[in-house]
Amino acid sequence: MSKKDYYKLLGVDRNASTDEIKKAYKKLALKYHPDRNPGNKEAEEKFKEITAAYEVLSDSEKRAGYDRYGHEGASGGFDFSQGFGSAGDFSDIFNDFFGGEFGSSSRSKAKRSTTGVPGADLRYDLEITLEDAFKGIQAPIHYVTNVKCDMCQGRGSEGATKPVQCHTCQGSGRIRTQQGFFTIERTCTTCYGEGEIIQNKCKKCNGSGRRRDEVNISVSIPKGIEEGAKVRVSGKGEAGAKGGKSGDLYVYVKITPHKIFTRNKADLHCKVPIRMTLAVLGGEIDVQSIDGAKIKVKVPEGTQTSTKLRCKEKGMPYMNSYARGDLYVQIIVETLNPNNLTKKQIELLKALEEEENASIQQQSEGFFSKVKKK
């Protein structure tokens, strides 16, 4: 770190009072603090410089030495050789100076550490049918995860023995070391922030309070659930360590493609082939709905292929509702295959073609006669 003028670094003149120096430092420290500038090396370097300047100028003896002999006269100083570490360490360093502006106090951190380590949330991918999504089901779920140890009931200790206070940190879970102007606070390396040590560890879980095992549960999948939706099962994730809270299980739903129906939210769509004569003359067709019931669908005269006929409230149920979406039946008019026709049917079609040709001829002659008159 380059040796710059401490007064210029803090933006004060050489006759500034201690209060003026403190105010200037606080303003700059808030601006360049690593917590407010994550990953910014320039801000980190600036912060180191102003901190070193403040440590000297806020101390009357060091300031006098600096004013007389420069940097060589300012003995001591803060050791920056170890870097800043985590942002959480500096939250504790500045708590007293800035009134907790950079995070919670060390006391609250120690308190949290004694509650154990929470378990992770888990994800389970469940594939169901469209019929399952229509009616809702109780789905059996099987997975392997860390569960609470049944021998020590999650305590981690053997028998009735209880954890004892960590002798290194005296139960706080944090270790404080003095470095010049600052008090550095870090996680205790003996108890790893727990504040206590298990002397007689459970033989089954080795003191962790949990073990690997299979889990079998039944999960309620509501009717009307859509593709990609997730169902949260509270407390069925990974068990916490040292008595920590268990995570949650998230069941993500995938719906198997259906042979007949496609889905758009609560609406269903299907394609139904009909005879050409039915499309021309009109009539009724039977369509099976998703619940297995038969629906009578009216086909209007002159229906063209790709026409969609709507069946109200015959689709999927809406989530948490008694209402249902609609079913849309797309008509596909089949072309007649001469190989499947009888001789009489072919004769009738030929007669129909002759009739149509005669009608078209008359229409054409009438059209051209009108053109000639013009």
From Swiss-Prot:
**What is the UniProt remark on how the cofactor binds and its stoichiometry?**
Binds 2 Zn(2+) ions per monomer.
* Metal-binding among keywords: yes
The stretches annotated as CXXCXGXG motif repeats are 149-156, 166-173, 188-195, 202-209
Start and end residues of each J domain: 5-70
Compartments (UniProt record): Cytoplasm
Primary location recorded for the protein, binned into one broad class: cytoplasm
Cofactor dependency? Zn(2+)
GO terms for cellular component: cytoplasm
Q: Per its UniProt record, what Gene3D superfamilies does this chain match?
A: DnaJ domain, Heat shock protein DnaJ, cysteine-rich domain, Urease metallochaperone UreE, N-terminal domain
Q: Where does Zn(2+) 1 bind?
A: 149, 152, 202, 205
Look up the record and give one Gene Ontology term from the biological process aspect: chaperone cofactor-dependent protein refolding
Q: Any idea which positions bind Zn(2+) 2? A: 166, 169, 188, 191
Q: What's an example of a GO molecular-function annotation for this chain?
A: unfolded protein binding
So which domain of life are we looking at? Bacteria
**Residue ranges covered by zinc fingers (CR-type):** 136-214
On whether Metal-binding is a keyword of this UniProt record, the answer is yes
State the UniProt keywords alphabetically.
Answer: Chaperone, Cytoplasm, DNA replication, Metal-binding, Repeat, Stress response, Zinc, Zinc-finger
What's noted about domains in the record? The J domain is necessary and sufficient to stimulate DnaK ATPase activity. Zinc center 1 plays an important role in the autonomous, DnaK-independent chaperone activity of DnaJ. Zinc center 2 is essential for interaction with DnaK and for DnaJ activity.
* PANTHER family in UniProt: CHAPERONE PROTEIN DNAJ, DNAJ HOMOLOG 1, MITOCHONDRIAL-RELATED
| Subunit | Homodimer.
Q: State the protein's purpose.
A: Participates actively in the response to hyperosmotic and heat shock by preventing the aggregation of stress-denatured proteins and by disaggregating proteins, also in an autonomous, DnaK-independent fashion. Unfolded proteins bind initially to DnaJ; upon interaction with the DnaJ-bound protein, DnaK hydrolyzes its bound ATP, resulting in the formation of a stable complex. GrpE releases ADP from DnaK; ATP binding to DnaK triggers the release of the substrate protein, thus completing the reaction cycle.
- What name does this protein carry? Chaperone protein DnaJ
This protein's species is Wolbachia sp. subsp. Brugia malayi (strain TRS)
Which gene produces this protein?
dnaJ
